[in-house]
Design a protein with these regions (language model features):
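Extreme N-terminal tail/first-helix region
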Residues: 1-18, 161
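Short solvent-exposed loop/turn micro-motifs enriched in small/polar/acidic residues
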Residues: 14, 28-29, 125-128
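Short Pro/Gly-enriched beta-strand edge/turn motifs at strand-loop
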Residues: 14-20, 114-117
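Short beta-strand segments
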Residues: 16-50, 55, 63-69, 77-81
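Short, surface-exposed beta-edge/turn micro-motifs
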Residues: 33, 41-42, 60, 129-130, ...
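Short, surface-exposed beta-strand-loop junctions and turns on beta-sheet-rich folds
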Residues: 51-53, 72, 148-150
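Charged, gly/pro-rich active-site loop segments
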Residues: 78-161
Length: 161
């Protein structure tokens, strides 16, 4: 990945707030937007365990996700198209690290609910009926309409920080 693309990819992951997850069960596709944070090569999000995208992802080896910057110019469309799997997060150390990042990225939550979001492990479950999940990408394609030599290329997630 070129240096300019790497910088744009880093900004995209850390500044974009919404990732769209897509699943398919019994030939019925479904997509859902979720707030996310990037940590340790994974995309973490909170969701209700009974939501359609979580229920439909159970037992699937592959789901898809995308993250794109918003633009009103076609030549500035830039983002990721991904395939991977969803995992429920239960390890306390991972949970605490991710919640701190989540609260930092979505600071309005801490302003509304205070420090209990970090201190109370059950906060998201009690308040929003949501659990922590991680989308682990197996394949990531960078889509960059500003690149004249090729609009789409597979990338290694480990280069993103």
């Amino acid at each position: 990945m070129e240096a300019g693309q790497l910088e744009k990819a880093n900004r995209l992951i850390h500044e974009t707030r919404v990732m769209t997850l897509a699943v398919c069960r019994n030939d019925i596709p479904w997509s859902s937007p979720v707030y996310f944070v990037f940590h340790d090569n994974g995309f973490y999000f909170f969701s209700n365990e009974n939501s359609r995208h979580i229920k439909d992802a159970e037992g699937l080896n592959s789901v898809s996700a995308s993250i794109f910057q918003d633009s009103d110019r076609m030549d500035l469309i830039f983002g990721f198209q991904m395939a991977g799997r969803i995992e429920t997060i239960s390890k306390m150390d991972v949970y605490l690290k991710v919640v701190k990042k989540y609260v930092s990225k979505f600071s309005f939550l801490k302003q509304i609910f205070g420090s209990q979001m970090i201190e109370n492990r059950q906060f998201f479950l009690e308040k929003f009926k949501s659990r922590l999940y991680c989308f682990h990408p197996d394949r990531i394609y960078l889509s960059d309409n500003s690149n004249p030599s090729g609009k789409r290329s597979e990338i290694d997630i480990t280069v993103i920080r």
